[in-house]
Amino acid sequence: MAPFVPYHYSAGQSTIVKFGGLLTTEFLEPPPGRCFLFRQTYRHTIEGSIPENLRKLINSPDRPKGPPPHFHQFQTEYFRVENGVLGISVDGVVRRITPEDGEISVKAGSVHNFFIHPDSPENMTVYLSASDSGNDYQLDRVFFENWYGYWHDALLHDGGIDWIQFLAIQDGGDAYTPAPAWVPFRRQVGYWTCVIVGRWIGGLLGYKPFFREYTTDWDFAVAKMKGSFFQRHLVHAAFEEEKSWTKQAELEPKGKPENAEFEPWTEDMSPAPLSLGPVAYEQGLFHGVQPGSVNGSNGHSTGVESKLEQLGSRAQRRVVIDDAGK
């Protein structure tokens, strides 16, 4: 398969919602000695009318209820349940974790995975963090933004997980998939498979561990990739020179440049003048009338609410509601 191209943009968001709300991640400022901290909520399901591909995923064995089994070569991971019940498997031993258990740790090198426990009510919320190893590739916000972004897009829109792409992203976050339990030295085999296939071979084939569409601190992600001989060719540094919109606006000349005999083609030749309304964008945000959504369930806006905020009189609101119901 060809290297992956993201389907959605989530960079710059401190709260990211994946799989239609099945998974919500809130990035927080980490405490001293930890390289990341986030609060994460898993739901068992999404009720109501949802897109067919999402419903199919929820009803399948691939339903996102937690990450696959993995281990961290250099970092200890910490879990603190806020509500609900967390299930966690560590080196084959499954535990049931509740808020009363306080913070628990999974030491570096332990094969583990966690999930929303079947005994949990509708949702489960947990705080996750990890020790700071000081390595370029480690569990941090850059990794999680890209893993959750790819996981979402691959399962919903790209036909499933691409093995090389998966290994490339996992290697970028000190998260490695172990070999089957019957394989001798399963952790070493898993680690070097991720490095050789994900970083070395994948890098040469154009597979990136990080994508700008998902990554808030892109400069940091670029610095990470530049540290690898096999990935530095994937980095394009021109973005560092891109000026902000304010700086670009300052470059606009006071008058329109002239183009001699070619000037007429740079002007509006239509006999009917172009009539444009006020610009609906302000500081990059759209403030015009929002179109109605095909799915207004689960608390998601249909666009009607936005129109009600923009229109003043009851008569105008009545027209909007009537039109939305047609």
Curated annotation (Swiss-Prot):
Q: Does the keyword Oxidoreductase apply?
A: yes
* Pathway annotation: Mycotoxin biosynthesis; patulin biosynthesis
Effect of loss of the gene: Completely abolishes the production of patulin and shows significant slower colony expansion.
Task: From the UniProt entry, list the residue stretches annotated as the region Disordered.
Answer: 287-326
Q: What class of enzyme is it?
A: oxidoreductase
Please give the InterPro entries that the UniProt record associates with this protein: RmlC-like_jellyroll, RmlC_Cupin_sf
Annotated Polar residues bias:
292-304
Q: Where in the cell is it found?
A: Vacuole lumen; Cytoplasmic vesicle lumen
Q: Decide whether keyword Ligase is in the record.
A: no
Task: State which Enzyme Commission number(s) the record gives.
Answer: 1.-.-.-
Q: What GO annotations for molecular function exist for this entry? A: oxidoreductase activity; polyketide synthase activity
Gene Ontology BP, a term: patulin biosynthetic process
Q: What triggers its expression? A: Expression is correlated with the production of patulin. Expression is positively regulated by the secondary metabolism regulator laeA. Expression is strongly decreased with increased sucrose concentrations. This decrease is lost in the presence of malic acid. Expression is increased with pH changes from 2.5 to 3.5 in the presence of a limiting concentration of sucrose, 50 mM. Natural phenols present in apple fruits such as chlorogenic acid or the flavonoid epicatechin modulate patulin biosynthesis.
Primary localisation category:
other
List its uses.
Answer: Patulin was originally used as an antibiotic and specifically trialed to be used against the common cold, but it is no longer used for that purpose since it has been shown to induce immunological, neurological and gastrointestinal effects. Genotoxic effects of patulin with dose-dependent increase in DNA strand breaks in brain, liver and kidneys have been detected in mice. However, more recently, it has been proposed that patulin might also have anti-tumor properties.
Q: Which domain of life is it from?
A: Eukaryota
Keywords, sorted A to Z: Cytoplasmic vesicle, Oxidoreductase, Vacuole
A Gene Ontology term for the protein's cellular component: cytoplasmic vesicle lumen
Family per record: Belongs to the oxidoreductase OpS7 family.
Role played: Probable oxidoreductase; part of the gene cluster that mediates the biosynthesis of patulin, an acetate-derived tetraketide mycotoxin produced by several fungal species that shows antimicrobial properties against several bacteria. PatJ acts with patO in the vacuole to convert gentisyl alcohol to isoepoxydon. The pathway begins with the synthesis of 6-methylsalicylic acid by the polyketide synthase (PKS) patK via condensation of acetate and malonate units.
What is the name listed in the Swiss-Prot or TrEMBL entry for this protein?
Probable oxidoreductase patJ
What species is this protein from? Penicillium expansum
* Gene behind this protein: patJ
